[in-house]
Amino acid sequence: MGKNSKAIGNNHVKSVYQALLQSLKSKSVNGFSKITIETISFIKNLYPEIDSVTSKFDNSRPDQSKDLTLYLKSGETISLNLFLIKKGRRIQPKNAGAKSFLEKYFLSAEMQKIFNKEFERYYLDYLKEVVEHKKGTHYITDKRELKRLVSSHFPKFTEEINLYRDKFLFNLRETCFTLLQQFYNEKNIGFTHAFNVFFMVNDTNIITSYGKDENDVKVEKFAPASPSLKDIELYKTGKSTVGIKFGEVGLTLRFKFESDPWKSIKLATGYHEFPKEKERVNVNLKTMRRMEKLLNKHEYAKTSNNSNAIGKCHEAWTYYYFLKAFPDVIQVDPKQCVELINTYFSSINQNTLKKLYSSTSTIVDAITEKLRQKYHDYIIESIELIPDAYIKDRLDTGDLQLVLKVNNNIIVENISLKALAKRNSKITTKNPGMGSILGPTYFNMGSMESVINEVKNKFTIGEFNHRKSLEILSYEFGMKLDSATQEQLRRGIHNLLGKAMIAITIYGEGISFCKEPSEIDGEVKVHVNVPSAIQNTLTWNNELESISLRAKFSKSQKHGWSSIKLTSECQLESRK
């Protein structure tokens, strides 16, 4: 709450208190404003037997006290919270501490501990990225020093660094949502406690709202009904907000910087009127119409990265067709799919764009059929496109995220979307480093570091050129794969394909199919230096499916030696 809002609220409390005192003494209150008179009239109708009243300003720490305390003639004590708002606005609950809210409100010290650990990791990454933006590559890890550098280079947020802020807050939101999802699925009573505290159920909450006219005053009691656990829903909105729907009312938890780029993070809480089905349908129709309007205004402008544009537009059209199939689904961010189309569709020629638009209509059936096989009965509650730059788990590279309700549990399903011109085209998955490919992130069977260092030394003295270095490294890597167990090979393939379900549209043929990443059938075979001296290939499912790993330098030859990457391309069987 801003200083001005706080002052207005405090003055309202003081005015109501003074008027109520006079009224209890049977004195006239005509000298007070209409707002004050209507408020005390409402209070006295609720509690006609008031003996006396005290204000929070009678205490030494008013901010930690209830606005008014009523002492009834029966001996009962009533705590009152007073709110004064313009008509159409919502009351603002007290903000919660980002590093304490899960323990304080949801009664989970363990969940708070996990969140705080992730918070520190993401905050350090954020500071490092902002400093790197200004200074280039660096090896500074001390948080205090990083904050000092951020404050000196960026005293305020600018367009230059907004992406790093948004990514950081997005990851906090995702971590919070995941923890609350687990908490919800455990049917934990912490949700009930959070509802009671945030919605002040043990107090009487009086909202006075006013319009432009002096006599336009409405006073009401804020007392939402306590929901059962089955009436509670989790949702997301924007890029930094988690929502909790308690029956008919919603509570939002929004992560934000207190002010400047190096300052602390706040958790702003707010009450949210959850959109009804008709409102959600209207929002979704508006999104679809905007996308259709763009399609009709298409003008082709040739660019070098056509395949990336096709992939991005495929993501947006998949989103579009989900809105069409599920017209009342909640959109986390209605603007994003429109922005995606607007950014990329001009890079695709008219014929290809029409094929892509038409063929993508088949993908919803492919995905929903796979979800039916997996969960039987489910409800899609929300839909979201995940920007590449925001992905926190490099093995979970989903483009589309669906939040599902399955047997009264909340399930998050990430889906990796691919668009191919032909059935036998290959899909690029990840670009892991040669140094880490055998480590725990992928195959978990050792390291290539000693081999890389040996080849690098020979490159440095001129014994090997770029091509020879890649051939030697690729062969050594292939031989290590050839000695791996089936379990290690399957693990590596799983991790290269990622955790997300894969949905593919073959837009040249107008079909789509969907696969779970766990579907690795039959023996995995290793083909060393196939199809070239700088590649190795793994095949499975009677060699109908494969991953090819091609070695390359991360920079062009003019830079000399640079880190070695592996381009991972897979070919999957197209099952309709």
Swiss-Prot record:
Superkingdom assignment: Bacteria
Known EC number: 3.1.21.4
Cofactor(s) the record lists: Mg(2+)
Assigned keywords, A-Z: Endonuclease, Hydrolase, Magnesium, Nuclease, Restriction system
Any one Gene Ontology molecular-function term assigned to this protein's record: type II site-specific deoxyribonuclease activity
Reaction catalyzed: Endonucleolytic cleavage of DNA to give specific double-stranded fragments with terminal 5'-phosphates
UniProt GO BP: DNA restriction-modification system
Protein's UniProt name: Type II restriction enzyme BsuRI
The species this protein was found in: Bacillus subtilis
Name of the gene this protein is made from: hsdRR
